[in-house]
Amino acid sequence: MRTGNAN
């Protein structure tokens, strides 16, 4: 699983 953000 990958977590994070994309701006």
Curated annotation (Swiss-Prot):
Phosphoprotein is among the record's keywords? yes
Q: Which domain of life is it from?
A: Bacteria
- Transmembrane stretches, by residue range? none
Name recorded for this polypeptide: Microcin C7
Modification(s) after translation: The peptide moiety allows entry into the bacterial cell, where it undergoes proteolytic cleavage to release the aspartyl adenylate analog, which is responsible for aspartyl-tRNA synthetase inhibition. Can be processed by the non-specific oligopeptidases PepA, PepB and PepN.
> Some GO term, biological process aspect, for this entry: which one?
defense response to bacterium
**Chain positions with N-formylmethionine modification:** 1
- Keywords attached to this entry: Antibiotic, Antimicrobial, Formylation, Phosphoprotein, Plasmid
The reply to whether Lyase figures as a keyword in the UniProt entry is no
Give the Aspartic acid 1-[(3-aminopropyl)(5'-adenosyl)phosphono]amide positions (modified residues). Answer: 7
Q: What does this protein do?
A: Antibacterial peptide, active against enterobacteria including species of Klebsiella, Salmonella, Shigella, Yersinia and Proteus, and strains of E.coli. Inhibits protein translation by blocking aspartyl-tRNA synthetase function and inhibiting production of aminoacetylated tRNA-Asp.
Q: Which cysteines form disulfides?
A: none
* Native source organism of the sequence: Escherichia coli
